[in-house]
Amino acid sequence: MEPWECAIAYHNQTKHHFRGYARSLGYLDWATQPDPFRRFDGAPFLPLPRTDEDSSPPYSDIYALDRVAPKPVCLRTISEFFYLSLAISAWKEYEGTRWALRCNPSSGNLHPTEGYLVIGPVDGLSDTPSIYHYAPKEHALELRTSFSIEVWKQLVNGLPPRSLFVGLSSITWREAWKYGERAYRYCQQDMGHALAACSISGATLGWRVHLINPMSDVDVAKLLGLDRREQFHEREMEDSEALLAVIPSLCERPPTLTPSAAAIEQIAAGEWHGQANRLSSSHVHWQLIDAVAESCVKPATEIDNLGSYPVGGGIRSVAPTTSASARQIIRQRRSAVALDGTTAISRDQFYDLLSRLMPGSNNVPWNTIGPPAKVHLGLFVHRVTGLEPGLYGLVRSPEQEEPLRNAMRPGFAWQRPPGCPTSLPLYLLSTGDCTTLAARVSCLQDIAGDGAFSLGMIAEFIKPLQRYGAWFYRRLFWEAGAIGQVLYLEAEAAGIRSTGIGCYFDDPVHDAFGLRGPQYQSMYHFTMGGPVEDSRLTTLPAYGADRAQRGIDPP
């Protein structure tokens, strides 16, 4: 079996069906719940400065690259970058139990994603280039290793001055503890959340964030110290996911950088600090996850093998929906637990937030995720004033419109809805009340039918895996997760609330849109509307004097 065929087999085996769910333990073993906070015991610890001063730009300015002037790289701006991407945003408390919320959403609030900083000398941080692990509970950095300025120059050769790197990894066990074999999907979905969170956080500082596509997973792991097996428990290893180049300047084109292999080898040969903390006392081993993870390891690839966005692709001018700052919207993001079934949004609001999802080389976060766009939206519209309820489709790449039309139900209307901007490829497929259908295909969850709308993210599936390789399976989830992160923030800006839905019946979703065969697959669901708040919960600040006593995230 080819690696891409293994990825497809995994996807098929981990589908939820009306007749039964993907394989998991079947219950929650609370005694082995993973610690959501990785620490490297013995590593030098550097708290990052925090400030209540909000100097971020208006939220509406962060989606275009030319609207925010770059801020200098310093200890304060490094802190702000993490504070608006991977940090804790609040704590919740109920009957003495406390759990953390973060700026980057996570399936089940289990947070498999870890972050790393690779940076040159910075006043107040270090006189030498270093690699750090980000500790969100303390909003601090843990020094993993340092290296010479000569090696640093080799590593960043080709990047503008003061550039830095951010690395991301996944601890699959955190998701597998609850979700079993389907956990690999959720780790990749959360990686998409995190990539978009980093891109958007960088945009608040005027920094451009680029995914370094050519790098292999092996090289990313070596650079971040993730291949040092003696420093991790064997069931709690971190899978390398991505290395981001963060550029604090208005460079016109993304870098075509592949960090020097010789520099990475020299860094790996240095002295590394810290031992990864144990997250659980025991583990359940899922061989299917091991198999798909091995198949989807990314090799080194050609710089331009993913192509480019279509010429002219870009977001239309969207009127500001809020006067709030970017920092306020990012840090108030929450996942809805229930929706009221009555709140509607206007047609123009609907068009504006969908416009944020259109890819383009100058649009955040799509400049980070990069081409090609392979994920489209199948929408269940319930309560949008000025639009008929029914099924709609958003085609996010023009070359996919004809294949999607041919793949979906022949009787669909494919009509342009009234007042829809010409730049937004949105189509009415069929009219009618679809609240029950939306809830039914989303694992019978009422929240999918109680919002203004819900959606399934439908990816072109077989051809990209055949063309690029099994590793592109992960990229489909990254793109879907990034869409989710933008929708989360757009809901907050519109004064409503949203949530991602990872539990859905895969093939019934395809049936709802008339999709037959494996060419298109649903990757992630989402809903937004008027929230029903749980008055039993107390909200506590993210960081304060009693933070060391706070608990861990429940599922």
At which residue positions do the language-model features occur?
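N-terminal accessory segments that position/regulate proteins before the catalytic core
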Residues: 1-486, 494-555
